[in-house]
A protein has these predicted regions:
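Conserved mixed alpha/beta catalytic, RNA-binding, or beta-rich assembly cores of soluble enzyme
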Residues: 1-160, 164-166
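C-terminal structured domains
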Residues: 144-201
Length: 201
C-alpha cells in the first residue's frame, strides 16, 4: 500500500509471460469498465424514486449496457512491458472514454420509477438475447463455464449480488441447476421472467 495506491508484485515463468500479460490486460480493463465507471455514475446519477438497492441495480445495468465495447476499447489502449498503472492508464490514455461516460450520464433521467427500471433492464436483456449464463449453487458461470466474479469490483454491502453478476455478464438467458437462494431467484425472475430455464436433473 503506497498511500491511496495498492501495488501488487507478481512473478511468473518466462514461458507464461505473454499469457499472463494478456490476462492482466483483461482484468485491468474490467477494473476500469466496472469500478471506475461505477464511481463516475454513482456521483452523477441520483435516480430519485428508487430505493438504495434498486439504484445499485440501475448502476449495474448502466455499466453492463456498453461493457463489451468499453472493454475492447480500453484493452486497445493498454500498452505495458512489465508494469501497468491502472489509475495512470485511466487518467492519461482514456480521456475519450471518460468523456463518453460523462456525456451518457447527462442523458440519464434524475428520477426513475421501479417500472422504468424494469423496462430498462428488460431492454438490455433483449439486446443480449443470444448470450447464456449458468447458475449453480448461487454462482454464475459464462458459456465456457468460467466462474463470473465481476460484481466483486462493485461496492460491498448491498443486496442483489447474484442479479448484478448476471447483469454484468451480459446475459440474455439464464440456465439454473443445483440449489439457489429463493429470494435471489425471486429477484432474477422479476427481471428475466421466461428467460430463466431450470434443470430438473
Amino acid at each position: 500500500n503506497d498511500g491511496d495506491r495498492f501495488i501488487i508484485y507478481i512473478s511468473c515463468e518466462d514461458e507464461h509471460l505473454q499469457l499472463f500479460k494478456k490476462e492482466l490486460a483483461d482484468y485491468s480493463a474490467e477494473i476500469i469498465c466496472i469500478a471506475y465507471k461505477y464511481n463516475l455514475f454513482n456521483d452523477s446519477v441520483s435516480a430519485q424514486g428508487l430505493s438504495v438497492q434498486e439504484r445499485e441495480l440501475l448502476l449495474s445495468a448502466i455499466i453492463a449496457a456498453d461493457f463489451e465495447d468499453d472493454k475492447r476499447f480500453v484493452k486497445s489502449r493498454i500498452q505495458f512491458d512489465t508494469k501497468i498503472a491502472v489509475d495512470g492508464l485511466f487518467n492519461f490514455r482514456l480521456q475519450s472514454i471518460l468523456k463518453k461516460w460523462e456525456e451518457i450520464s447527462t442523458y440519464i433521467p434524475q428520477h426513475f420509477t421501479r417500472e422504468e427500471l424494469k423496462e430498462f433492464i428488460g431492454y438490455l436483456i433483449s439486446e443480449k438475447r443470444g448470450r447464456k449464463v449458468y447458475i449453480k449453487d448461487d454462482a454464475v458461470y459464462d458459456g465456457q463455464y468460467r466462474k463470473m466474479e465481476r460484481s466483486n469490483l462493485l461496492p460491498k454491502g448491498y443486496e442483489n449480488k447474484l442479479l448484478k453478476e448476471v447483469l454484468l455478464s451480459g446475459a440474455g438467458e439464464i440456465f439454473i441447476s443445483g440449489s439457489i437462494n429463493k429470494s435471489e431467484y425471486g429477484r432474477l425472475s422479476d427481471f428475466f421472467g421466461d428467460k430463466i430455464f431450470i434443470s430438473r436433473g
